[in-house]
Design a protein with these regions (language model features):
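Conserved glycine-rich cofactor-binding loop
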Residues: 16-17
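Short, small/polar-rich loop/turn modules that mediate ligand/substrate recognition or access, typified
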Residues: 85, 183, 188, 240-245
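Catalytic loop of short-chain dehydrogenase/reductase
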Residues: 94, 133, 137-170, 175-184, ...
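C-terminal substrate-recognition "lid" of short-chain dehydrogenase/reductases
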Residues: 221-251, 256
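Conserved glycine-rich Rossmann-like NAD(P)H-binding loop of the short-chain dehydrogenase/reductase
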Residues: 30-47
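Amphipathic alpha-helical dimer-interface segment in Rossmann-like NAD(P)H-dependent oxidoreductases
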Residues: 77, 116-139, 179-180, 184, ...
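Substrate-binding pocket helix/loop in short-chain dehydrogenase/reductase
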Residues: 100-102, 106-114, 202, 209, ...
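Catalytic Tyr-X3-Lys loop
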Residues: 103-123, 146, 171
């Protein structure tokens, strides 16, 4: 189904674990050339790359802290130097940072949350834009930018997660502007919006707590990262979604139904 992704050049930010890593694996299985990214070099990087490169594609690790605008540009530059261009950008970097109710939020916390969840996607996309445009023109198809939203972007977030929810809602909104002004360049912009997944995001919860929370969803449980990964392939594939732009695909087990 995703045969047209073979050889495609895919940059995935924040992809050393969880949903991001599952996406790296999925693209590698499809035969793509993929850059895994993270702030820190994983302790098991050598073994991870060996495993990933045995799946059928080519995977490298490019370290960068994408909450820093300067490093966003360097990341894109490093990727293009390695692969010669960009066909697909997945803005997966993000995180809660911490939980603070409104009375406790200060400038430092505001900056940390928005830099990681909003600014990173903006700046990486900004630097990738000319390369995505060039790839679309060269291939005669479309390039793809995939944002990663959240159910919190709809609901406002849980206790102490209001800023996180707002940062994700910002992504839901800014995508509309990018669609309006850059789809003409052969670039499609779409969003994968996960619900509650069993990742490090919920590492503070024990299994009983996760089971209790998950029982309140129609699917009755948390999602697994590998269940979200195929949605990235769908939006990346011109054959599957060449006429789809500006859309949000909610992957949440029925937790929230817009």
């Amino acid at each position: 189904m995703f045969d047209d992704l073979k050889g495609k050049r895919v940059l995935i930010t924040g992809s050393t674990q969880g949903i991001g890593l599952a996406a790296v694996e999925a693209f590698a299985r499809a035969g793509a050339k993929v850059a895994m990214n993270g702030r820190r070099t994983p302790a098991d990087l050598e073994a991870t790359l060996a495993r990933l490169n045995g799946l059928g594609g080519e995977v490298v690790f490019l370290p960068a802290d994408v909450s820093d605008s300067a490093e966003c540009g360097k990341l894109v530059e490093s990727f293009v130097e390695r692969f010669g261009g960009i066909d697909v950008l997945v803005n997966n970097a993000g995180g809660l940072v911490g939980r603070k109710p409104l009375p406790e939020i200060d400038d430092d916390f505001f900056d940390a949350v928005t830099d990681l969840n909003s600014r990173s996607a903006l700046m990486v996309t900004k630097h990738a834009l000319p390369h995505l445009k060039a790839a679309a023109a060269q291939n005669g198809t479309t390039s793809s930018v995939i944002l990663v939203g959240s159910v919190a972007g709809y609901t406002g977030g849980g206790p102490g997660a209001g800023l996180y929810g707002a940062a994700k809602a910002w992504l839901h909104n800014i995508q509309k502007n990018w669609v309006a002004f850059h789809t003409k360049d052969g670039i499609r912009f779409n969003m994968v919006s996960p619900g509650t997944f069993d990742t490090a995001f919920h590492a503070d919860k024990d299994e009983d707590t996760k089971a209790r929370i998950g029982s309140g969803f129609p699917m009755g449980r948390f999602g697994r990262p590998e269940e979200c990964a195929p949605t990235f392939l769908f939006f990346a594939s011109h054959a599957c979604s060449g006429y789809i732009t500006g859309q949000v695909l909610d992957v949440n087990g029925g937790q929230y139904m817009p």
